Amino acid sequence: MTAAATRKLVRAYYERFNAQDVEGFLDLLTPDVVHEISQGGSEKGRAKFRAFLLRMNRCYRERVSDLAIMTDADGGRAAAEFRLDGRYLETDGDFLPASGQRYRLRVGAFFVIREGRIARISNHYNLKDWLRQVQR
């Protein structure tokens, strides 16, 4: 896959994220996708990723902007940096109670691409900053 094709794939990933298009989002992933959650472990497979997306869409309303995508020369790896603006709508597990709190974070993500699809996603953001913002 070329670097340009990888940039297009990663951009499509975030477009579908913004649209909350779960099935379209999953179409971009390999069946055995590995999702490394910021400060929270790792999950494998589309079914687990689907469950993650459905929970996120229920508990949060988020939008990616100011997206910068970088790739290696052959398009096998990519990185993205972006701003994430969100609202915390429904209490998520053991986190603080949700009441529509707004937040804004800088996020970094890393991707491995295999056969034209995303095979690994690793997201990184400052959880302490998020907690500070939603405690207000």
Predicted features, each with a name:
Residues 1-136:
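C-terminal and inter-domain tail/linker signature
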